[in-house]
């Protein structure tokens, strides 16, 4: 089975269609596979094509009466939520997938064989080969075969590659007024270089220089003036506002973000974070040596940033506090390897910074008189 179609198709999550003629067993296959995918920690959405139309409500119920009166209906219950739209306000397949991709790990499409989506084709008992006009078939599952095993084997090989094929950017979180440090952290010097310059170099070396973006406002070292820059959304406050700006700018991308107060971060730390990407893992937040999580030098998938914006909106002050990042679903908090652990050490006062410089011999102490 080929993996040549590894891409996201603009929907924020990997998409795979399961196609075949009526009676080929598409629903039976998905019904058996979905519990296995969920057991692996994946959030799965299915978009089903029904060419004959369907009824999903009971005639005479309040919701059905309001729908037939011309309204779009949204029903909310303790265990499920449902939306019913009429023909005039229905969503396209593309928009439906884009919306579902915000909070799911895998999007499966049953049917829609005439689309450009990558497809698994299911042979039927009497009709097997797909019509010539059906494109994007990546594999065919014969009728008399263990199709569930073949489907799961394909997903296990394809999904990690598709997940990691989504763009990965580096975001340098700029400091505010620099109350504790005396100046904004990005321009504070450490060993003859600005902290912002040190962290930006780590991001650029660990990813690609053109994928490093400045997040936030404030003065800059001259060496960073050429980097792309995103302003914080005016309706949000707090250090997470920069992540919201990043997600709105590139909603399909994952981000490794780094604050300017990590003087020990290097490309190896960024590469280690990037290597932690897994389907179903929305965020990776490393621990410092003392066990405290460090959300300001971490990895966030687009689903995580979508969830973070919802959490920040729930705050009366729209404060995107760093602690909000710890509440993102499907977040892995883990201890980095010992040889990398110092990368998550941060400095918050001029005294801490000078002590680190002196410890490493980066400054010359005046001679005693």
Residue spans for each PLM region:
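Charged phosphate-binding loop/patch that engages nucleotide di/tri-phosphates or the phosphate backbone
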Residues: 144-167, 331, 342-368
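N-terminal phosphate/diphosphate-binding loop that engages ATP/GTP or pyrophosphate donors
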Residues: 34-91
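Nucleotide and nucleotide-moiety/phosphate-recognizing core
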Residues: 37, 51, 61, 67-70, ...
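Short internal beta-strands
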Residues: 46-48, 75-77, 137, 213-216, ...
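Phosphate-binding/switch loop-helix module in NTP-utilizing enzymes
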Residues: 85-115
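Walker A (P-loop) phosphate-binding motif
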Residues: 2-52, 166-171
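Phosphate/Mg2+-binding loops and adjacent switch elements
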Residues: 106-163
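Glycine/small-residue-rich pyrophosphate-binding loop that anchors the diphosphate of NDP-sugar donors
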Residues: 28, 296-297, 322, 343-344
């Amino acid at each position: 089975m080929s993996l040549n179609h590894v891409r996201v198709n603009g929907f924020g999550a990997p998409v795979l269609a399961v196609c075949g003629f009526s009676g080929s067993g598409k629903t039976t296959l998905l019904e058996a596979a979905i519990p296995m995918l969920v057991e692996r920690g994946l959030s799965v959405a299915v978009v089903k094509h029904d060419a004959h139309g369907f009824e999903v409500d009971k005639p005479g119920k309040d919701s059905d009466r309001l729908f037939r009166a011309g309204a779009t209906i949204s029903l909310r219950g303790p265990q499920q939520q449902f939306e019913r739209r009429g023909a005039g306000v229905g969503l396209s397949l593309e928009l439906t997938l884009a919306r579902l991709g915000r909070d799911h790990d895998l999007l499966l499409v049953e049917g829609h064989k005439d689309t450009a989506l990558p497809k698994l084709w299911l042979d039927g008992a009497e009709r097997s080969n797909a019509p010539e006009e059906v494109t994007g078939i990546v594999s065919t599952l014969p009728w008399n075969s263990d199709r569930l095993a073949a489907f799961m084997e394909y997903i296990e090989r394809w999904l990690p590659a598709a997940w990691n094929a989504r763009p990965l950017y580096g975001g340098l979180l700029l400091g505010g007024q620099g109350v504790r440090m005396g100046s904004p952290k990005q321009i504070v010097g450490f060993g003859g270089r600005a902290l912002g310059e040190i962290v930006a170099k780590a991001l650029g070396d660990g990813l690609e220089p053109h994928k490093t973006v400045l997040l936030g406002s404030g003065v800059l070292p001259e060496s960073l003036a050429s980097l792309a820059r995103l302003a914080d959304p005016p309706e949000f406050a707090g250090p997470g506002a920069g992540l919201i700006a990043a997600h709105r700018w590139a909603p399909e991308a994952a981000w490794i973000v780094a604050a300017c107060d990590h003087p020990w971060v290097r490309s190896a730390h960024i590469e280690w974070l990037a290597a932690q990407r897994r389907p179903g893992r929305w965020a990776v937040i490393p621990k410092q040596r003392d066990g405290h999580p460090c959300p300001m030098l971490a990895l966030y998938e687009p689903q995580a940033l979508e969830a973070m914006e919802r959490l920040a909106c729930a705050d009366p002050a729209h404060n995107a506090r760093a602690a909000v990042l710890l509440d993102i679903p499907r977040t892995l908090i883990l201890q980095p390897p010992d040889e990398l652990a110092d990368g998550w050490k941060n400095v918050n006062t001029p005294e801490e910074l000078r002590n680190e410089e002196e410890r490493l011999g980066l400054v010359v102490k005046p001679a005693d008189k």
